[in-house]
């Protein structure tokens, strides 16, 4: 049976580090919100059959967007993990795999999705880039304790690609155990799996701080040329 590919976008966060008057996914670049740019990437990728968007119960902005019929809304949770799990629980398709992608990561390119979908190992895979900067470990006083060996360190990105049933079980168990689940792969790791690292691109940035907006606008403009 062929795999069905479904995208889940957790978009219930408030993005406090942006210091903006609205959640960062609703900030506007080039005439569209960050969320719309991100949705456009998934909507235009032929293999993605459906997009599940997890938004806050009291989100006042989502109703202002014109959403494609392929997009299904679900209520987000209080954490990213809960939002993703709510999205997974809305998937009834058999043999489904999920691409979990950050709503505020609008510069993703289809070529990177191609590389993820080439992975058939049920341990799954994530986009990531090797760490190139020197990494320092700090103490509670923000003083350097040691310099880490970066030779085997990677910076995790999204999308993260897993079989729906495996990720659903891993997230559910992790949440019940009170685990610190910072991305989907961390839940998969706790379940005993070893996801593949697929080399991505540094321009697939997550808009987190105000200075990221100009860089995202540059990449989006370049990608449309």
Curated annotation (Swiss-Prot):
Pfam families: IspD. It comes from the Bacteria. InterPro entries: IspD, IspD/TarI, IspD/TarI_cytidylyltransf_bact, ISPD_synthase_CS, Nucleotide-diphossugar_trans. The record marks 17, 24 as: Transition state stabilizer. It is an enzyme of class 2 (transferase). Keywords: Isoprene biosynthesis, Nucleotidyltransferase, Transferase. GO terms for molecular function: 2-C-methyl-D-erythritol 4-phosphate cytidylyltransferase activity. Its EC number is 2.7.7.60. GO terms for biological process: isopentenyl diphosphate biosynthetic process, methylerythritol 4-phosphate pathway. Pathway: Isoprenoid biosynthesis; isopentenyl diphosphate biosynthesis via DXP pathway; isopentenyl diphosphate from 1-deoxy-D-xylulose 5-phosphate: step 2/6. Gene3D superfamilies: Spore Coat Polysaccharide Biosynthesis Protein SpsA, Chain A. The record marks 150, 206 as: Positions MEP for the nucleophilic attack. It catalyses: 2-C-methyl-D-erythritol 4-phosphate + CTP + H(+) = 4-CDP-2-C-methyl-D-erythritol + diphosphate. Catalyzes the formation of 4-diphosphocytidyl-2-C-methyl-D-erythritol from CTP and 2-C-methyl-D-erythritol 4-phosphate (MEP). HAMAP family: IspD (MF_00108). Belongs to the IspD/TarI cytidylyltransferase family. IspD subfamily. This is 2-C-methyl-D-erythritol 4-phosphate cytidylyltransferase. It comes from Haemophilus influenzae (strain ATCC 51907 / DSM 11121 / KW20 / Rd).
